[in-house]
Amino acid sequence: MRVRTRTGRRAAGALTAAALLLSALSLTGCEADGGHRGSSGRPGAPDGLTDGAPSGREPASAHHPGRGGPVRPAARPDPAPELFRELPGLGPRTREELPDDSGQVLVVTGTGHDSSRSTVVLYERVAADKKNHRTRSGTGDAGAAWRAGASWMAHNGLRGWTERHHQGDLRSPIGVFGLTGSGGRRKDPGTLLPYDHAPRAFTIHGSGSEGEPLSGSFGYVVAIDYNRRSGTSPLDPVRPMGGHRGGGIWLHVDHGGPTQGCVSLSRKNMKSLLLTLDPRRRPVVVMGDSASLAR
């Protein structure tokens, strides 16, 4: 399957009827399976995630009583973004897997090896500016640093993480993977990634592990380059390592519970991610539980 470009975003309509009728459930590791129970305790929740605030931003303070009623303190400008010489939480073995020319790294950190909860932060490589930014010390290129974006809550596989993913194990794969293709039921929000707008093919029905509806989960999708051909549509069924090693591992819209192996974010954050990722910066995702990433 050839790489889709901006001029070919409507090519999904030219797919054969058989390809369109192929259920998204058979292509993605996030297939519905109502026989498993997760740990969220929020069955049926439409989102289930709380957006994190950008690093360094203070929460709103309480009102102060006065003659004229409640008074808010004067607004303060947001502090300068914090820069890092090294990507936080990644050990030497993990850092060695990162491409030298990657300028965008999405770090997905699981709370535990068997946990379905994780935190997502997008880091972008920038020139270090010691005068205007706080920079944490560490080893690395003295002329470059990593700027952290907002911290987002996410779900991953129901049973946590694994270094050797197999079809149906309900765990998300640990490793560093490219982010080279996107798509979804919703129209292209303006991403620079190749976007496959295929409403019928990205339709999903049924319930998740906690009984929550899965409808809308594939409104926005970014394919994670695990066991797939780089640069193709997320719907590409080819599995270079074989079907037994699973596939269809995506970043997609959260449905309020654990996934079958994908990583899910709120729809707002998925849209923000799509608008930020730039293929010219060779974006990658590094994902796994915190202990595995720290090695």
Predicted regions and their residues:
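Secretory targeting and sorting signals
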Residues: 1-34
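Cell wall/extracellular polymer interaction/catalysis modules
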Residues: 30-253, 275, 290-295
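Extracellularly exposed regions in secreted/surface proteins, prominently low-complexity, repeat-rich
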Residues: 249-252, 258-295
